[in-house]
C-alpha cells in the first residue's frame, strides 16, 4: 500500500504537487491523467524518492521511502530513458537488473521469455548498445526491466510513449 501524507513539492513559485492525503491499496491500478506540467512525473519521482519533498511523506507498505530503502526490493519503476544504462546492450542491462534482485542469468533468461512478443525481435540479439535503439525500443527495455523481478508495486510514467500501436496491446 502507498500512503501519501501532506505531500508538497514546489519549484520556485510553482506548486507542482500538493496532496493532503491519498492511499493506494494492494491490487489497485491507478492511471494519472493531466496536462503537461501538471505534476504527474513529479509525483512519481517523490513516491520513488528521486526528489525530496518540501513537506510531507510517502510510505510504501509502512516504510517511509525517504528513510529506508527496503521498499525497493518489491518495487519496479520506469520513468524515462534516464533510468537505462545506455552503454550496455539490452542483455547486459537485463542481467545487471536481475543481479540487483538476486536473479541468476538463467532466471533472467526465463523471465524474458514472456516478453518476446512485446520485443518483436527488435531488442534481443541485436549486438548494439541501448543508446543506439529507437525511443520505442528503449521504452520496451525500460518497461521489461521494471517488471523483471515480479514487483508487488509497478510504477510506469507514460508507458505507451514511443510504442508502436502493435506493442501497446
Go through each PLM region and give its residues:
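A short, proline-enriched helix->beta-strand linker immediately N-terminal to the Walker B motif
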Residues: 148-152
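Helix-to-loop junction immediately C-terminal to a conserved catalytic motif
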Residues: 48
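Conserved ABC transporter NBD signature motif
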Residues: 56-71
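Conserved structural motif at the start of ABC-family nucleotide-binding domains
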Residues: 2, 17-19, 72
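Conserved ABC ATPase "signature" region
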Residues: 95, 99, 107-125
Amino acid at each position: 500500500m502507498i500512503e501519501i501524507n501532506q505531500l508538497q513539492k514546489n519549484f520556485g513559485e510553482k506548486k507542482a504537487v500538493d496532496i493532503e492525503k491519498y492511499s493506494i491499496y494492494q491490487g489497485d491500478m491507478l492511471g494519472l491523467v493531466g496536462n503537461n506540467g501538471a505534476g504527474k512525473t513529479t509525483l512519481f519521482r517523490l513516491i520513488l524518492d528521486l526528489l525530496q519533498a518540501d513537506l510531507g511523506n510517502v510510505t510504501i507498505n509502512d516504510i517511509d521511502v525517504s528513510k529506508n530503502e527496503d521498499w525497493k526490493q518489491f518495487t519496479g519503476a520506469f520513468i524515462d530513458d534516464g533510468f537505462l544504462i545506455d552503454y550496455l546492450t539490452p542483455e547486459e542491462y537485463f542481467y545487471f537488473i536481475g543481479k540487483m534482485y538476486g536473479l541468476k542469468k538463467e532466471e533472467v533468461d526465463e523471465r524474458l521469455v514472456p516478453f518476446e512478443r512485446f520485443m518483436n525481435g527488435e531488442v534481443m540479439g541485436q549486438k548494439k548498445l541501448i543508446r543506439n535503439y529507437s525511443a520505442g525500443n528503449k521504452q520496451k527495455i525500460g518497461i521489461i526491466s521494471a517488471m523483471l523481478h515480479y514487483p508487488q508495486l509497478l510504477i510506469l510514467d507514460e508507458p505507451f510513449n514511443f510504442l508502436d500501436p502493435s506493442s501497446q496491446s
